[in-house]
Amino acid sequence: MSSGGLLLLLGLLTLWAELTPVSGKNRPEFCNLPADTGPCKAYEPRFYYDSVSKECQKFTYGGCKGNSNNFESMDECRKTCVASATRRPT
């Protein structure tokens, strides 16, 4: 295979890995924790995975402590915790 073909294959595999959602079996345990603002009083918009709705939701983080179900962006939350409802086992 030519180096151009290998480069294309590598690019496609990288894209596939980025776009493939996390399966429920592989979802980190902390994704099931509730949103936790923590004891501090800052106002930081953040996102958490809501295991009931199975979607990432916005919440206000106080700036300290809390838990690991706390993401700076919706995209980061989705990449880490959202499982695809349409994904079929292989």
Swiss-Prot record:
Top-rank taxon: Eukaryota
Expressing tissues: Expressed by the venom gland.
Signal peptide, first to last residue: 1-24
GO molecular function terms listed in the Swiss-Prot or TrEMBL record: serine-type endopeptidase inhibitor activity
Gene Ontology CC: one annotated term: extracellular space
Primary subcellular site in the record, as a coarse category: secreted
Pfam families xrefs: Kunitz_BPTI
Domain BPTI/Kunitz inhibitor: 31-81
Site location (Reactive bond for trypsin): K41, A42
Disulfide bridge partners, by residue number: C31-C81, C40-C64, C56-C77
UniProt subcellular location: Secreted
Keyword annotations of the record: Disulfide bond, Protease inhibitor, Secreted, Serine protease inhibitor, Signal
Stretches of the chain forming a coiled coil according to its record: none
Family: Belongs to the venom Kunitz-type family.
Function statement: Serine protease inhibitor.
Name under which the protein is recorded: Kunitz-type serine protease inhibitor bitisilin-1
